[in-house]
Every structure is written in C-alpha cells, then in structure tokens.
C-alpha cells in the first residue's frame, strides 16, 4: 500500500481537511506510509482526543484559511470550500480521487439521488455469490484507502459515490451507473445545476471504451458523455435496458436477452427496486454472468434497512420503515407499493426542495391519516393551508410535535389490517 500512496505525499506538506471517519482513515494511511514533510489537521471542531501531538491542529471558523500553506490537502466529502477550487495554490485531493487514479479500470461506480446504496449492495452481493473476487467501498461506509492493499488485478470494485465524493473528481470509473437525479442537497449546492454537475462527474472523465448505464430521466447531452451510453428505463422500449411490466410478469430486456424478475421470491418491493435490479442485471450481463447465477444471488439478497423495511405487526397493524425516503419521488413510490397504507408519517430535516409533487399526490391518494412532523412536515402543512385550497379532505392532516408524538398518534388511529 505504501508505494501506492507515496507519490502523493513524499516530501510534501500535507493537510487533512476534516477529521471525521474518512479524515481519520486518511490520517492512519498516510502516517503508516511516512515520507511526508508534515501532516497537519484542520477541522471546524476540536477533537475529543488528538491522535498525534506532533501534528498541528487548526480549528474554528477560519480553519480553511491555512490551506495554501500546504502542498497537498486531502479534503473530506461534504466540506464546502470557501472559494472555487482553481483559486487554491495547493493540490486538493480526496480518498476517492487517489483510489480511482490507482484502480479506475477495475471500478464499477454507482451514483444517484436515491437507489445507489441498493444498487451497490445488490451488485456486490450477486457478484460475490457467483464466486467473483469483489470489493465494496465508498459512500456505503467503507473508506477506500483502508483497503488498497487488498485489490488484486482481477478484483471487481463496486464503489458507491455520493455527490460530495464526485464534486471535484478528475477521473471516472470504467463502468458508471447513474441511477437517477432528483432535487436534493440544495442546502449544500444552492442550485440544481450545481448538484447535477457534481453527479455527472461519474462519466465526465470516462474514456471511449468505458460504459455509462444511465436512467433516461437524466440523460446527459451526447457532447459531454465520452463513453458508450446505455439508456435504461421503466416501460421505455427505445432503451438498451428496459424494465417492463408485462401480462406475465416484470421483465428485464437488455441487448438480446430477456429475464423475468422472480418478484414473489425476493424481498425487494416496488417498481423503483425492479429498476435497480434491472441495472444490476445489465452490469452482470456485461461481466459475463449467466441468468442462473444472477437469480441465485438475487433470491438471497437481504435489503438494506430503512428502505420499505418491514418492522413487524402489532394489534393487527403492519409497520414499515422507509425513512431513507427524503425526496418526493421515493415517498410516492413507497405509497404506491404499499397500497393499503392507512397512516403515513412524513417529516424530518428540510433540505430546501420543492414538495409540490408530493402534496399533489397526497391530495389524490387514499391514505386516511397523514401525520406531519419536524421541519419538513411543518413546512408541508403550512404550504397546503396557504397555497392548496383544493387539497382534498384536509381533516386527514395531523400536525405532530415530533417523531415520538407522531408514532403515538399513528398507533391510536390506524385501523387493523
């Protein structure tokens, strides 16, 4: 591993910008490699315990002011730079950038507003189940540099990429998957254009022989996609990868292949998850996997928590956790999937997105009780009463003080069955 990281740090003054999970991982990797002139740390908050008395610590609101005092800065995802990256004299890197520079030809990169973790974990599980040498890294919670020494020449690296990891990337994966793009993280990016630009970095630096599988809902202009583009969609016949609802089941059509999803034998629910399965099927087909091996992996996959997760039944009422749904589309898809929903709880941190689509759906849907809570719920409640006089059956709306209050009320009013 040392020889992989050494060219980036040897003889240089190195700064870690951010000391969360990834920053701490980067610190240990660089410390082990050695050869740097200095290794310092800058973060808004002071750490509870300093791992190195030799390191200089820069903390507080002005912690970014020192960046140009260093040759190399390793930036943690999510930190907003105070000025455009081209205005810094230092070289700004990330774990993801360095790892991709070393192994990009072996990487299958996945991004999207929603669904990327499901696609990532499902693809990894199916490849692993089929006996392939496979590794899962990235935004799913596993720092990349911790595992550099485990990569072999034939290792398939399944890498989940957030918009924050992609934001300043100068290299793209051999196979890129863009699951979707919806309005989110506007508290960070301020404009939708900036958010889309970050997501599109997954393919911007691909090569001619690389592959991009992209949802037709967020297709890039051909002029900015240098690789082979495979369009994917639901009930979209003019795509290279189509997930289609047909009289005899849900089918995946990819190139010259057709595969029926065994929906009654798997734990992934809903059309949005069938699209995710279709994307994974496309990658597995590209890698030469037969349908039997794909089915074996699909049937043994355990969905990630908080994604239409069945929690159990109490007093005749079934409880589901779909708290990963932080945008309109996924909330609507969840309600469409669970057709007998009697009560839904909606609320959380307000990321500044437009909730009109969700409000219009809630007005028309048959859900008997809509419990709204926290910042998002209160905003939706206020917008309905201020801007939507046509909202149907307003007594369905219940404003709760917080999550605990919302759950208590839901248990009191939800009908068995």
Residue ranges of each PLM-predicted region?
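Short, basic phosphate-binding NTP loop
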Residues: 1-109, 130, 299, 307-309, ...
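Nucleotide phosphate-binding/pyrophosphate-handling subdomain across enzymes
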Residues: 5-13, 23-29, 133, 261-368
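Phosphate-binding loop of NTP-binding sites
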Residues: 28-31, 64-70, 77-216, 220-228, ...
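Short, conserved loop/helix-junction motifs that constitute active-site signature segments
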Residues: 34, 172, 202-208, 224-225, ...
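Short internal beta-strands
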Residues: 37-44, 212-216, 345-346, 366-375
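C-terminal helical cap/extension that packs against the catalytic core
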Residues: 50, 357-416
């Amino acid at each position: 591993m040392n020889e992989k990281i050494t060219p980036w740090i040897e003889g240089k003054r190195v700064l870690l910008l951010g000391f969360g999970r990834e920053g701490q991982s980067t610190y240990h990797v660089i410390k082990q490699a050695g050869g740097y002139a200095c290794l310092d740390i800058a973060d808004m908050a002071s750490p509870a315990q300093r791992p190195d008395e030799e390191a200089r610590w820069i903390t507080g609101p002005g912690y970014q002011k020192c960046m140009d005092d260093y040759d190399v800065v390793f930036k943690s995802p999510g930190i907003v730079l105070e000025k455009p990256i081209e205005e810094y004299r230092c070289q700004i890197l990330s774990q993801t950038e360095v790892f991709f520079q070393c192994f990009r030809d072996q990487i299958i990169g996945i991004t999207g507003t929603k669904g990327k973790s499901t696609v990532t974990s499902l693809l990894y599980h199916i490849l692993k189940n089929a006996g392939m040498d496979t590794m899962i890294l990235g935004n799913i919670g596993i720092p990349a540099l911790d595992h550099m020494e485990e990569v072999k020449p034939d290792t398939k690296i399944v890498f989940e990429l957030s918009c924050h990891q992609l934001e300043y990337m100068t290299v793209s994966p051999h196979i890129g998957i863009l699951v979707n793009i919806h309005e989110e993280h506007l508290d960070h990016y301020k404009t939708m254009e900036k958010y889309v630009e970050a997501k599109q970095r997954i393919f911007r630096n691909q090569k001619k022989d690389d592959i991009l599988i992209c949802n037709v809902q967020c297709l890039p202009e051909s002029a900015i996609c240098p690789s082979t583009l495979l369009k994917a969609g639901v009930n979209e016949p003019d795509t290279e990868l189509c997930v289609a609802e047909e009289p005899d089941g849900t089918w995946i059509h990819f190139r010259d292949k057709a595969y029926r999803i065994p929906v009654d034998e798997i734990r992934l629910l809903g059309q949005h998850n069938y699209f995710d399965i279709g994307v994974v099927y496309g990658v597995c087909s590209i890698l030469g996997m037969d349908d039997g091996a794909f089915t074996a992996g699909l049937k043994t996959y355990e969905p990630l928590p908080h994604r239409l997760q069945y929690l159990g039944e109490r007093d005749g009422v079934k409880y589901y956790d779909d708290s990963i749904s932080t945008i309109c589309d996924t909330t609507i898809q969840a309600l469409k999937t669970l057709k007998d929903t009697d009560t839904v709880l909606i609320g959380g941190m307000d990321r500044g997105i437009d909730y009109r689509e969700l409000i219009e759906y809630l007005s028309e849907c048959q859900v008997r009780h809509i419990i709204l809570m926290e910042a998002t719920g209160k905003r939706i409640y206020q917008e309905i009463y201020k801007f939507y006089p046509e909202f149907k059956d307003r007594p369905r709306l219940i404003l709760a003080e917080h999550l605990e209050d919302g759950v208590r009320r839901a248990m009191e009013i939800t009908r068995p069955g």
